Amino acid sequence: MIQEQTILHVADNSGARSAMCIKVLGGSRRRYAAIGDVIKITIKEAIPRGKVKKGEVLKAVVVRTKKGVRRSDGSVIRFDTNACVVLNNNEQPIGTRIFGPVTRELRTEKFMKIISLAPEVL
């Protein structure tokens, strides 16, 4: 469950290290985002000479949460950190590599690129 002011790790090589959620997109008063939801973020920490800079406001998709995701068979997949992948305005990933596992819930038409770049799909 990601809400406003949540700090997330960035799981790609866009140059951002950490980001803060400033808005959950999709709905007028939507409070929480789960895995696969698009959020608006601001970059809090970035590496030098990266593709993104500190203070930029971008979109991102949530790929890992501590809360996890419940499958239809009753199993729950949880992670140690909250993580996101930075997107451009066309909702395509800015980075060319994804770090760490992602879940099958991202397997929609919009995020197949993230699935194909990820080292492990749970």
Curated annotation (Swiss-Prot):
Highest rank taxon of the organism: Bacteria
CDD domains registered for this protein in UniProt: Ribosomal_uL14
InterPro entries on file: Ribosomal_uL14, Ribosomal_uL14_bac-type, Ribosomal_uL14_CS, Ribosomal_uL14_sf
Keyword set includes Ribonucleoprotein: yes
GO MF terms held by the record: large ribosomal subunit rRNA binding; structural constituent of ribosome
Keyword annotations from UniProtKB, A to Z: Ribonucleoprotein, Ribosomal protein, RNA-binding, rRNA-binding
GO cellular component, one term: cytosolic large ribosomal subunit
Pfam families (UniProt xref): Ribosomal_L14
Biological processes per GO annotation: translation
Role: Binds to 23S rRNA. Forms part of two intersubunit bridges in the 70S ribosome.
The family this protein is said to belong to: Belongs to the universal ribosomal protein uL14 family.
Subunit structure: Part of the 50S ribosomal subunit. Forms a cluster with proteins L3 and L19. In the 70S ribosome, L14 and L19 interact and together make contacts with the 16S rRNA in bridges B5 and B8.
Annotated HAMAP family: Ribosomal_uL14 (MF_01367)
Name of protein: Large ribosomal subunit protein uL14
Source species of the chain: Buchnera aphidicola subsp. Acyrthosiphon pisum (strain APS) (Acyrthosiphon pisum symbiotic bacterium)
Upper lineage: Bacteria, Pseudomonadati, Pseudomonadota, Gammaproteobacteria, Enterobacterales
Gene: rplN
